[in-house]
Regions:
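Conserved RNase H-like, two-metal-ion catalytic cores of nucleic-acid enzymes
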Residues: 31-35, 41-45, 51, 183-236
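A polyanion-binding, active-site-adjacent surface
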Residues: 1-182
Length: 236
């Protein structure tokens, strides 16, 4: 039998939800116990205020619902990006799926790597944050991963995560307005020849002089530039 348990809270009719990792001491001691009322919850509230998202209109939950054991007991994530899930961890993930299937959410925000793993079976919050993914435990449910609010408060103090969380919350707010997953069609051209590459660089230079923004993505492997990508519009 569990010594501690913190169930979900919020609006069960909501279109937008947030999923954290595990309750903390303040959540367990709250009366009644509920998620996101500790320091990380206060950080989340600050982000919600900045993005004008009413907390009362959201559904809030966690992957792990107790504080009987450390998070790594349920889902253990290594520094190499590998993870293992215990039997109890699988039970919680399965329960989360049933919980979310009973709702009518359009999108849920995954706070942190553990929520990302549970909801999408993916790992790498820095890589996936801000993306719109489909949940693997609730088909059709959109998931927007972002950093956990605990990352920008003591003791971690990663202050730059706060505006990124706000940006991702705004993305989730927009996605909550409709059910379907909308994909942008992109024209991607790869393995360009020398002449085509020079022409592309000249084109980027010319439109850059006219004030158009050029996005550049540089991939570095073992300290050497492996490839460079240029984008001059959301589709090209």
């Amino acid at each position: 039998m569990k010594r501690t348990y913190v169930g979900p809270s919020g609006n069960r009719e909501a279109k937008l939800g947030c999923c954290g990792e595990q309750p903390g001491v303040q959540e367990v001691r709250a009366s009644p116990p509920r998620p996101f009322v500790g320091p990380a919850g206060q950080g989340m509230d600050e982000c919600l205020q900045m993005t004008r998202i009413p907390r009362l209109e959201m559904y809030l939950t966690n992957v792990i619902k107790d504080l009987d054991a450390p998070l790594s007991h349920y889902i253990n994530l290594t520094s190499q990006g590998k993870y293992t899930i215990s039997k109890e961890g699988y039970q919680y993930i399965q329960g989360l799926g049933e919980e979310l299937k009973s709702l009518d959410l359009n999108v849920i925000v995954a706070f942190g790597n553990i929520a990302l793993i549970a909801l999408t079976n993916r790992v790498g919050i820095t890589k996936w944050r801000g993306s719109v993914l489909e949940s693997t435990i609730v088909p059709g449910l959109k998931v927007v991963p972002t950093f956990h609010p605990a990352t920008f408060i003591p003791p971690k103090f990663n202050f730059l995560n706060k505006p990124l969380i706000c940006e991702d919350l705004l993305r989730a707010k927009y996605e909550s307005e409709f059910k379907e997953i909308r994909r942008t069609r992109r024209n991607i051209r790869i393995k360009r020849g020398f002449r085509e590459s020079v022409d592309t660089l000249n084109y980027c230079y010319e439109i850059g002089l006219r004030g158009q923004t050029i996005d550049i993505d540089i991939e570095v492997i073992n300290g050497e530039v492996d490839c460079i990508a240029f984008a001059w519009s959301p589709t090209d």
